[in-house]
């Protein structure tokens, strides 16, 4: 018998790559595993050359089903194929009788499979909602809206079948209620975590840093993908308006994900470069992949540049920049959560962010005379002059030491956003629901009844006067699905159909 406090847990995730959602799944699985629970991750895709180290080295058990299925057709219908791949995965788990091997199944991102699991599994089902999928989809044009409609309805229906729903922030929780107005679920919040261990800085990144920055240089930092919705322009405008940028040794470093095959990345980088020109701020653009191709790093000298654009940097260089920056400028509005501010705070760096979305929960905004002992940065409207004022205020505070960001940031991250804190939240939410009896929904009862009725009629039509299929179904229901009610039904049908007069 399984001990009450040691659970068997399975995660179901669409694509176990190296994104933020994947990092959350890996951290959650590791945290629960370290608490003594038995954990496995099921996914439709996992490339061992492009995944997190804990997956690559076998620290976490991962099984893949359905990777042979396409992810799209001619660059379209991604949601259709994501649904097909997930349903294939779950059907394989059902056929292999794995769905009843777990006390808890955590479904991440895509909810389509939840009703199927609810019918065929005895496990408690938890859905982790990063953000309603229907709000992430683009709906340009009537055809696109019509195309998305059934998937929006499926999302609302499938989420309702979960035993419990959790979300990544109170901001997402409010959005969940506004989106799924007909659901009674009241999600709890489980914050994503940040790895508290430090990343080893590669030698090439140390050399590059010494080449790009002179002794005594200071810089503000922006880390975001080169996309318009990230509003990186706000950082440039605020920096240009700040008093601190007048100093020759002060720079702004803008770095983030960039793919030259993605038109938006290319266009937005050009737009930011043009904006720097408008403010008469000299700038240099460095494509990180070129660094390892060049033997002489002196070609990357940026002595006269006020703004440095860096594309697709390594985790090592990202860590080094966060360690050395004056402050992180986190520009996106209405972020669902936002992990980068936590990465800065864990290193004791202040963060300036927009006063909405996830940062309202992660950053403790400085209020003079009130919270010097706990402040970790500033939350301001996306108004350049207000951000410029915050930049200058941060400089004064760092000089006079009235706020100890080096202490406040790590303390806040460890308390609320560590792997231990996230694991504890998961365990608390599991214990709330895992002891409850399985709920049977009207649609579920109708669906099962209708399916059995159709089978019954099919047997009568295809195999008239043959009772043995009914006995097979009775045995199948009891031994395979552990459904004794329908086992009794089919046994009763068999008894009524058996030709006793031939005995």
From Swiss-Prot:
Task: State whether keyword Lyase applies.
Answer: no
**Topology relative to the membrane, per the entry?**
Multi-pass membrane protein
Q: Which Pfam families match?
A: Glyco_transf_4, Glycos_transf_1
| Localization annotation | Endoplasmic reticulum membrane
The pathway is: Protein modification; protein glycosylation
The residue ranges crossing the membrane are 64-84, 112-132, 443-463
**Reaction(s) catalyzed by this protein?**
a beta-D-Man-(1->4)-beta-D-GlcNAc-(1->4)-alpha-D-GlcNAc-diphospho-di-trans,poly-cis-dolichol + GDP-alpha-D-mannose = an alpha-D-Man-(1->3)-beta-D-Man-(1->4)-beta-D-GlcNAc-(1->4)-alpha-D-GlcNAc-diphospho-di-trans,poly-cis-dolichol + GDP + H(+); an alpha-D-Man-(1->3)-beta-D-Man-(1->4)-beta-D-GlcNAc-(1->4)-alpha-D-GlcNAc-diphospho-di-trans,poly-cis-dolichol + GDP-alpha-D-mannose = an alpha-D-Man-(1->3)-[alpha-D-Man-(1->6)]-beta-D-Man-(1->4)-beta-D-GlcNAc-(1->4)-alpha-D-GlcNAc-diphospho-di-trans,poly-cis-dolichol + GDP + H(+)
Q: Which residues are glycosylated?
A: 170, 303, 371, 400
Q: What GO molecular function terms would the record report?
A: alpha-1,3-mannosyltransferase activity; alpha-1,6-mannosyltransferase activity; GDP-Man:Man1GlcNAc2-PP-Dol alpha-1,3-mannosyltransferase activity; GDP-Man:Man2GlcNAc2-PP-dolichol alpha-1,6-mannosyltransferase activity; glycolipid 1,6-alpha-mannosyltransferase activity
Superkingdom in the source lineage? Eukaryota
* Stored InterPro entries: ALG2, Glyco_trans_1, Glyco_trans_4-like_N
List the EC numbers from the record: 2.4.1.132, 2.4.1.257
> Where is this protein chiefly located?
endoplasmic reticulum
UniProt keyword terms in alphabetical order? Endoplasmic reticulum, Glycoprotein, Glycosyltransferase, Membrane, Transferase, Transmembrane, Transmembrane helix
A GO CC term?
endoplasmic reticulum
Q: Which GO terms describe its biological process?
A: dolichol-linked oligosaccharide biosynthetic process
**PANTHER family in the cross-refs:** ALPHA-1,3/1,6-MANNOSYLTRANSFERASE ALG2, ALPHA-1,3_1,6-MANNOSYLTRANSFERASE ALG2
Quaternary structure and partners: Interacts with ALG1.
- Provide the function of this protein: Mannosylates Man(2)GlcNAc(2)-dolichol diphosphate and Man(1)GlcNAc(2)-dolichol diphosphate to form Man(3)GlcNAc(2)-dolichol diphosphate.
Q: Any further remarks?
A: Present with 1840 molecules/cell in log phase SD medium.
State the similarity comment: Belongs to the glycosyltransferase group 1 family. Glycosyltransferase 4 subfamily.
Quote the protein name from its UniProt record. Alpha-1,3/1,6-mannosyltransferase ALG2
Q: Look up and give the organism this protein is from.
A: Saccharomyces cerevisiae (strain ATCC 204508 / S288c) (Baker's yeast)
Q: Gene that codes for this?
A: ALG2
């Amino acid at each position: 018998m399984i001990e009450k406090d040691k659970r068997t847990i399975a995660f179901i995730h669409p694509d176990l790559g190296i994104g933020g959602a994947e990092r959350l799944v890996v951290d959650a699985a590791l945290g629960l595993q370290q608490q003594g629970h038995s954990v496995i991750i099921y996914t439709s895709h996992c490339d061992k050359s492009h995944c997190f180290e804990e997956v690559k080295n076998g620290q976490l058990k991962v099984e893949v089903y359905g990777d042979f299925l396409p992810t799209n057709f001619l660059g379209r219908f991604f949601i259709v194929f994501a649904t097909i791949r997930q349903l294939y995965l779950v059907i394989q788990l059902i056929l292999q009788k794995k769905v009843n091997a777990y006390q808890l199944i955590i479904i991440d991102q895509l909810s389509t499979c939840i009703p199927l699991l609810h019918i065929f599994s005895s496990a408690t089902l938890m859905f982790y909602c990063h953000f309603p999928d229907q709000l992430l989809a683009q709906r340009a044009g009537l055809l696109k809206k019509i195309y998305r409609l059934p998937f929006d309805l499926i999302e609302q229906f499938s989420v309702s079948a979960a035993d419990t729903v959790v979300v990544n922030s109170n901001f997402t929780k409010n959005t969940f209620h506004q989106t799924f107005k007909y659901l009674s679920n009241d999600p709890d919040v489980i914050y994503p975590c940040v790895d508290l261990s430090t990343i080893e800085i590669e030698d090439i990144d140390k050399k590059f840093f010494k080449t790009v920055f002179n002794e005594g240089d200071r810089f503000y930092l922006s880390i975001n993908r080169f996309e318009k919705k990230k509003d990186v322009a706000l950082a440039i405008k605020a920096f240009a308006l700040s008093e601190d940028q007048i100093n020759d040794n002060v720079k702004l470093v803008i770095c983030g994900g960039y793919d030259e095959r993605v038109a938006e990345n290319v266009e937005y980088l050009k737009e930011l470069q043009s904006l720097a020109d408008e403010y008469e701020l000299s700038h240099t653009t460095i494509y990180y992949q070129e660094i390892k191709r060049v033997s002489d790093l002196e070609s990357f000298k940026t002595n006269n540049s006020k703004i440095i654009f860096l594309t697709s940097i390594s985790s090592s260089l990202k860590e080094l920049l966060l360690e050395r920056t004056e402050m992180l400028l986190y520009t996106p509005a209405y972020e669902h959560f936002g992990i980068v501010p936590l990465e800065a705070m864990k290193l004791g760096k202040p963060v300036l962010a927009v006063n909405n979305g996830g940062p309202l929960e992660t950053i403790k905004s400085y209020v003079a005379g009130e919270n010097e002992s706990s402040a970790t940065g500033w939350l301001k409207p996306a108004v350049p002059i207000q951000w410029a004022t915050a930049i200058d205020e941060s400089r004064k505070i760092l000089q006079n030491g009235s706020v100890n960001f080096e202490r406040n940031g790590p303390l806040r991250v460890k308390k609320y956003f560590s792997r231990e804190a996230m694991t504890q939240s998961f365990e608390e939410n599991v214990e709330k629901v895992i002891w409850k009896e399985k709920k049977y929904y009207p649609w579920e009862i109708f669906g099962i009844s209708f399916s059995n009725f159709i089978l019954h009629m099919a047997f009568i039509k295809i195999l008239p006067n043959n009772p043995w299929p009914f006995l097979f179904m009775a045995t199948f229901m009891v031994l395979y699905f552990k459904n004794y009610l329908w086992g009794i039904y089919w046994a009763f049908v068999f008894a009524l159909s058996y030709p006793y007069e031939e005995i």
